Amino acid sequence: MDKTINWTGQRLTLRIEKVAHGGIFVARHEGRVVFVSHVLPGELVKAVVFEDRGGSFCRAEPIEIIEASEDRVPHFWKEAGTDGPQRALGVGGAGGAEFGHIKLERQRQLKADVIEEALQRMAGVELRPVVEPVPGDDEANGLGYRTRVQLHVDEAGEPGPYRERSHDVVPVKHLPLAVDEVNDLALHLKNWQDVKKIEVAVSNTGQVHYSVDKKPKQEGKLVERAAGRTFRISSGGFWQVHKGAADVLTKTVNEMVAVVGIDVDAPNLDLYGGVGLFAGALAAKFANRLRITTVESVKQATEDAKLNLADLPAVRAVCAPTERFAAEQASAVAAGEADYSRATVVVDPPRAGVGARVVGDLLTMAPLHIVYVACDPVALARDLKGLLAGGYQIKALKAFDLFPHTHHVETIVSLVRNSK
């Protein structure tokens, strides 16, 4: 392919073929792949190329929908849609709602397509999941679920999200994906001159905290309830974005563990453990004497985990990068100084996945059961390839739509070690 080719600015008529990872869609023109946003499979569109670095593909934005899919709906959020003048210019709207032009049921089918293709292409697994909604989301049309929001501020002091593919701020008066408590703050009524970023967090116990340029405006920790337990989170600490996510995820992990069984005396692990959500939920479900270590690299989150798990005598929280901790444990196993053969290990890594090093260390540790909680299907499939080749098999896989109207999807996989 000619590396010097450049279609930037050209207008192309394209038939959209399928969805791709990252919330974009695939078309082809003159032997090249064209990645197009804000469209649907089967649609015929006119699109303008906004990025072309040569090679086998370029990126485009639709400027006219010639033949629309029956799954297309008016975007629920005017500032994020591409209707009207923005479409004619090929300019995206506010980020964070890139699937807002698609019926909810079809969004989930597209997310299942992405998971299915990633598993097949990268892990050699033929499996199509059903992407399940969080209870209540269908009734709310997938709106009003975000409990964590980040807004940026433009030169005029008006807050809003970034425009897609840019650092231009789109001023907004309402955030349809956010819970009511966020919108009740009416942040748009205040001038935020000289401020760069506003972050808002709402707990399911009714607290509303926000920070301005990383400086908290309230004292104390946020208090969340999940899996029948109380969790305290320091300002800026991680908690699931969807108001129902923590309960859905802990319930699913606990169910997967129950099917396989858990040895309460084994050296069980909760890797990338955050504030202790999965460790606490497992201990509460299976026995308060469950032995489990939660491992987290962020010091403040580890301190929160110690507080949250203080009533569980056999649970400990360790502050360490999972990569270092896993390497140390793998070395101990290789030296005959540790035994994880009866253990259950929960991993909930960031978007990049656990990576080849941790996969290798897990294979050396050889726990009986691994439960992998993933927010990126491609990273998950890459890691599964190594785990499956190393002697594990998929016992169960479930997927959840924790981010309606976006391309993001959560997948949980139960892996058991093959009998030797």
Task: Show which residues each predicted segment covers.
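C-terminal catalytic and target-recognition region of SAM-dependent MTase-like enzymes
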Residues: A178, T322-A332, A338-D339, G355, ...
